[in-house]
């Protein structure tokens, strides 16, 4: 009897071990598959890319933060063209888009965009839709569709690379982006930075370019502009920004790289000073009386989460800034984005002109 019981216990233990092993292997292969797809997408980036943006929608969908972000983004419920696309193709980017990489290449005054997306496509339906809304042509081994839509006033081309992968480009030659195999020097420059961001489902890597400084200045919030900060950012060779969901929050990490230790030190000191200045400003008694308490609390949470570090990687010197974006901050940002600007509100003129006196009033004064 005891022997039978021992065998049962041994059988249960063996079964549990086998199930656990199978689960671990499945998880391992699933992660390897996602990592392999990500790596392969990034290897297709054109060699002359200036900026690369990567988004893993599958990983983001598993996080509560995506729901918060989706609720924050304004939606157009009357986008008839997109609704027609969904009806005709059965493809919805909210549900079926898995991964996408976008490469931006600057050539002086000309900017080219090349994007590759992985998703659950019904290829026949999608190609039929493109055929109805554009013209098809064979470019090498690719059947490309020239769409009626444009990007930067240039024709937009789209082609299936496989049943699950599609490419978009505004190059004159639609196969130029896919056919341009990056060199070893390209991989040597970009891959270490891609690998550092391997745990982030959302990131952008930017190689220094004269247009980047202008774009960063244009994107400054609230019209904020600092010549000193612009000059320091202009001395960075690389900038990377990554986001990683953590429950209903998003951890954002921005890093600037340069070869000059002095530039890294000056940038770190400037950002530390800016952080301290912002914290002191929010604690100013006069500002606290004027400011919405919830808005102030959201900004304070953001600033308290900030961490600024200097990193030494041999010849490369980096400054890293980490922040945590909370649902409370998104709510405040949404309210701020929909608020009516002060210069558009109806206000009486500062020096209202008196109405001209009528002839009757003039005659009365003479009397």
Protein language model features and the residues they cover:
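A contiguous, surface-oriented mixed alpha/beta subdomain in the mid-to-C-terminal portion of proteins
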Residues: 209-270
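A conserved glycine-rich beta-strand in the N-terminal activation segment of trypsin-fold
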Residues: 154-216, 222-224
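C-terminal regions of proteins
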Residues: 236-246, 250, 255-257, 288-315
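Solvent-exposed, non-transmembrane alpha-helical starts
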Residues: 124, 176-180, 264-267
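Helix N-cap motif at beta-to-alpha junctions
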Residues: 119-122, 171-174, 257-263, 325-329
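Short, Lys/Arg-rich N-terminal segment immediately upstream of the first membrane anchor
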Residues: 1-6
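Structural boundary/hinge residues at secondary-structure and domain interfaces
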Residues: 7-153, 197-228, 269-307, 320-327, ...
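A short, solvent-exposed beta-edge/loop patch
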Residues: 53, 152-183, 244-249, 309-330
């Amino acid at each position: 009897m005891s022997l039978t019981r021992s065998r049962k216990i041994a059988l249960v233990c063996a079964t549990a071990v086998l199930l656990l092993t199978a689960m671990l292997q499945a998880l391992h292969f699933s992660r390897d598959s996602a990592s392999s797809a990500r790596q392969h997408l990034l290897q297709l980036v054109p060699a002359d890319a200036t900026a690369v943006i990567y988004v893993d929608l599958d990983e983001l969908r598993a996080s509560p933060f995506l729901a918060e972000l989706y609720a924050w983004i304004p939606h157009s419920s009357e986008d008839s063209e997109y609704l027609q696309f969904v009806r005709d193709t059965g493809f919805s980017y909210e549900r079926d888009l898995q991964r996408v990489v976008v490469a931006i290449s600057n050539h002086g005054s000309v900017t080219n965009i090349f994007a590759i997306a992985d998703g659950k496509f019904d290829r026949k339906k999608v190609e039929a839709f493109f055929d109805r809304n554009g013209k098809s042509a064979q470019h090498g081994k690719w059947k490309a569709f020239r769409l009626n839509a444009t990007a930067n006033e240039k024709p937009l081309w789209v082609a299936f690379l496989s049943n699950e992968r599609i490419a978009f480009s505004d190059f004159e030659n639609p196969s130029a982006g896919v056919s341009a195999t990056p060199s070893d020097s390209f991989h040597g420059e970009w891959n270490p930075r891609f690998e550092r961001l391997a745990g982030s489902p959302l990131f952008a890597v930017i190689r220094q370019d004269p247009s980047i400084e202008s774009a960063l200045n244009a994107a400054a919030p609230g019209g904020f502009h600092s010549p000193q900060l612009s000059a320091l950012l202009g001395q960075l060779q690389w900038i990377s920004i990554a986001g990683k969901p953590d429950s209903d929050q998003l951890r954002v990490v921005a890093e600037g790289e340069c070869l000059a230790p002095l530039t890294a030190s000056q940038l770190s000191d400037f950002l530390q000073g800016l952080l301290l200045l912002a914290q002191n400003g929010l604690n100013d008694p006069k500002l606290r009386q004027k400011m919405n308490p919830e808005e102030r609390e959201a900004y304070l949470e953001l600033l308290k989460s900030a961490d600024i570090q200097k990193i030494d990687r041999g010849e490369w010197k980096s400054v890293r800034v980490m922040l945590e974006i909370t649902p409370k901050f998104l709510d405040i940002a949404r309210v701020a984005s929909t608020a009516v600007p002060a210069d558009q509100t109806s206000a009486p003129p500062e020096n209202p002109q008196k109405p001209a006196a009528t002839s009757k009033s003039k005659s009365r004064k003479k009397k």
